[in-house]
UniProtKB/Swiss-Prot annotation:
It is found in: Plastid, Chloroplast. GO terms for cellular component: chloroplast; cytosolic small ribosomal subunit. InterPro entries: KH_dom-like_a/b, KH_dom_type_2, KH_sf_prok-type, Ribosomal_S3_C_sf, Ribosomal_uS3_bac-typ, Ribosomal_uS3_C, Ribosomal_uS3_CS. Part of the 30S ribosomal subunit. Its main location: plastid. The keyword Oxidoreductase does not apply. Pfam families: Ribosomal_S3_C. This is Small ribosomal subunit protein uS3c.
């Protein structure tokens, strides 16, 4: 059987960089990983509660974390200014306080910045979230996939593949459906491929969404 490797990990050091950057002694490694997970969960939960638009669409493309001895720098990359949390300055300060409490680490400063992405539909996380929202609203999975591909094409991507697995349209037997448009060269290391996997809870059960986007070739 074919062995599937994560496209992001496969390209680390060439076309992809680490989303979390820090150094630790082996005995502290697991604690740092758990800390990263707490930061990501806390930010996503806060944004979900305090969004300007109550559609359930967070629009977070990715989170970048950099740690130093006395500082944790978190960068939130978002797709649209309409999805910014209420009152940017006050909201970021509240978010920073929430994350600091969750980490229970007062000897390090926490700095959070928000960066807007120029072409949001070039980001697989945002497209996956869009598809998930459509599926929750009982839109046909094929229609949701085709619309996501249209949005990606408008962002001038070179290729995209969208895959959904589970009890599609409420059928009793789970299956996998996918659509590809353009080139998605997964075996070419110099090809910059963005990838994400996303789970969505629907009335028929859990569906898994995977998206590969061919951005450029170096």
């Amino acid at each position: 059987m074919g062995q599937k490797i994560n496209p992001l990990g496969f390209r680390l050091g060439t076309t992809q960089s680490h989303r979390s950057l820090w150094f630790a002694q082996p005995k502290d490694y697991s604690r740092n990983l758990q800390e990263d997970e707490k930061i990501r969960d806390c930010i996503k939960n806060y944004v979900q509660k305090h969004m300007r638009i109550s559609s359930g669409f967070q629009g977070i493309a990715r989170l970048g974390i950099q740690k130093r001895i006395d500082l944790i720098q978190v960068t939130i990359y978002i797709g649209s200014s309409n999805l910014l949390i209420e009152g940017p300055t006050r909201g970021i300060e509240e978010l920073r306080t929430d994350v600091q409490k969750k980490l229970n680490s007062m000897n390090r400063r926490l700095n959070i910045t928000i960066t807007r992405i120029a072409r949001p539909y070039e980001q697989p996380n945002i497209l996956a979230e869009y598809i998930a929202l459509q599926l929750k609203n009982r839109v046909s999975f094929r229609k949701a996939m085709k619309k996501a591909i249209e949005l990606a094409e408008q962002a001038n991507t070179k290729g995209i593949r969208v895959q959904i697995a589970g009890r599609l349209n409420g059928k009793e037997i789970a299956r996998v459906e996918w659509i590809r448009e353009g080139r998605v060269p997964l075996h070419t290391i110099r090809a910059k491929i963005d990838y994400c996997s996303y789970m969505v809870q629907t009335i028929y059960g859990v569906l898994g969404i995977k998206i590969w986007i061919f951005v450029d070739e170096e």
